[in-house]
Swiss-Prot record:
Keywords: Disulfide bond, Viral envelope protein, Viral matrix protein, Virion. Gene3D superfamilies: Viral matrix protein, C-terminal domain, Viral matrix protein, N-terminal domain. This is Matrix protein. It is found in: Virion. GO terms for molecular function: structural constituent of virion. Disulfide bonds join C251-C295.
Amino acid sequence: MAETYRFPRFSHEENGTVEPLPLKTGPDKKAIPHIRIVKVGDPPKHGVRYLDVLLLGFFETPKQGPLSGSISDLTESTSYSICGSGSLPIGIAKYYGTDQELLKACIDLKITVRRTVRSGEMIVYMVDSIHAPLLPWSGRLRQGMIYNANKVALAPQCLPVDKDIRFRVVFVNGTSLGTITIAKVPKTLADLALPNSISVNLLVTLKAGVSTEQKGILPVLDDDGEKKLNFMVHLGIIRRKVGKIYSVEYCKNKIEKMKLIFSLGLVGGISFHVHATGTLSKTLMSQLAWKKAVCYPLMDVNPHMNLVIWAASVEITSVDAVFQPAIPKEFRYYPNVVAKSIGKIRKI
């Protein structure tokens, strides 16, 4: 059984809420485009910003009309039917313009999509019609991008492989950053196991403004009977000298000295940000790659939950530090359902 420590409410109440995207339709019954920007850290209030941008929209295929063979077939615009919803993360860039200029440039993009497979299912994006506001992102947009299908598409199985598919941008999520980079805990360090150490994990509890049960995300009832969602992230490990005894008070004291501040961003959909404003041990600092501000995109932590709540209002209701013995190095991690070198199963 793990020991826990609940962080005070002030650690997440200032920037622990994300407002929902307004899902409104116009006279043509199409969703009205909207841009949503949140701030993480201490970005400049005016002028140049570092923006991480995520495009949200719909996958569409041309409607099959009657083959009349008339000249009007060449002049009439093609109508499309929606076959799914998804996103396109385009990353961080230095941006000089306004929010509305960015929105206009994003919805004017012509994006074609292809569903394919490597070790897992992938979505390929090819982009054209890149206007001036998007020039800071043009390098990666022109090259085309490939993403894990389960991270960027709500139902990749609904995307046909025998039809042309376009991605129509409707919403733009932007995260205005106080620094040029988003620091993530390297996987090798997150998987680090040391003897005589305690793993410090964070249990983040959220309140989402959308019903999630029908989409496969079951909420948990809190003490007041309210439906909440939660996920866990790994912060690091605390290590003591051989022979020293760990106590809950010792671990709590270590955590309190860090003076952690939590916030929500829109990196990859919904993202959880941790900023250490206090003192960190050298062991923990090295695990965080010597950064005091760390980002955990829900797209990486829990992709399906991210797909379900990325357009909704989201609020942090509590954050708990969970102290657990570090998993011994002798334990083998099996990333695949089929374990290699067992019986007649061999890795090719």
